[in-house]
């Protein structure tokens, strides 16, 4: 099956109309801030409580594979920048059927992530007494409407908002790392207890709850790294991706390792793992325990910003992905048009509409909404990352066959690192199905999702074929025929 020519109209037209409004500083901060969000600021509390201090090992291992995925994405972007990102690459290397599945799984990811973020925002607001009388679903709805309004204006404003929101998140983590290190180095007691490694020995060691909980939290940790792929989508709206992308990816990997692994180690050294609670930010717990309630409020405001930023990024990315799919016939037609400011508003509104289902979930199951949706969203993350790696492997294979030339910025140790990453992602997916509490939700989502994807493809395949043949007639290219087959 021959690939599409990267100059083919079907691959380039989906990027027409976008304003190249993102600058280098914005792209780098989007790449960094996109991966520092709700999964760390809120989710780490419950994972520390269930897995203990050894949680940092899981963050470290997952971080290695995240690095490989980012490098694979970087190689693809330098091969051909596109706002359709990995969905466009799936179309190029595997055909429209794979692009259809990858695109809708990614939409599922961000639609569910939006629910996670609005749920987290409601939890954060309930930290303050003034908001406690307000129902969780009401706060979630307000958050969704505010972020939707911001996202519909322009990509330049999106980039600026994400830059400052990401900067706030980074400053918050750096502040915690500095304050926490001072308490640790000074051997100051917190809440009447010693700090340091002695906390581990006095509370059951590095894995006090056993190895199984450490393994089971892996899916949640994977979700904490979600949104790293956002930099690939944003690359399609920057003027110099070949110059900016390698710098952004390489700098982000080291900083994420420091922030994620460093933060979880420090949290475990400052307080016993039993001090942390599900649905409560561990950073808020720390600052409250050291007797600075105002600091806890400030940190709570910061993590609230993180959730709003993640929600904003999700609406941004799905709008671009759905437009790419719509132009090629596999997405709803109303997601293809753009506003005068270069915003694909149809996909953004569709994602926000799905987010309304999360508002209902918050009203029915407020205590379980976060974890239920997180595990479903994680399947979309895994599908997106697997698609990125699979596309890089195909690019590598074709380069070896002399069909195209690989960029200089490459995934290290390819193809072996790619196969290892795919095996890791498959292992995480299996673990999610065996999760005692949330496994049934995963099974239910699969039972509903797989037939929906199959049925969806049969609904759109004739339109996909028509679009493909139109491109063949227009470009006189036979390279697109494989994507036109309605199998």
Swiss-Prot record:
Gene Ontology cellular component terms for the protein in this record: extracellular region; plasma membrane
Family recorded in the similarity comment: Belongs to the amino acid-polyamine-organocation (APC) superfamily. Amino acid transporter (AAT) (TC 2.A.3.1) family.
Assigned keywords, A-Z: Amino-acid transport, Cell membrane, Membrane, Transmembrane, Transmembrane helix, Transport
Consequence of gene loss (knockout): Asparagine transport is partially impaired in the mutant. Knockout mutant is impaired in nitrogen incorporation from asparagine into other amino acids, such as glutamate and glutamine. Growth of the knockout strain is greatly reduced at pH 5.5 in the presence of asparagine as sole nitrogen source. Mutant is not attenuated in immune-competent mice.
Gene3D superfamilies: Amino acid/polyamine transporter I
GO biological process: amino acid transport; transmembrane transport
Keyword Cell cycle: no
Pfam families associated with the record: AA_permease
Job of this protein: Dual function in both nitrogen assimilation and in protection against acid stress during infection. Involved in asparagine uptake.
InterPro entries: AA-permease/SLC12A_dom, Amino_acid_permease_CS
Membrane spanning stretches: 26-46, 50-70, 98-118, 133-153, 163-183, 214-234, 256-276, 290-310, 341-361, 369-389, 414-434, 440-460
Protein name as annotated: L-asparagine permease 2
Disulfide linkage: none
Main location: membrane
Source species of the chain: Mycobacterium tuberculosis (strain ATCC 25618 / H37Rv)
Keyword Transmembrane helix: yes
Membrane topology category: Multi-pass membrane protein
Subcellular location: Cell membrane
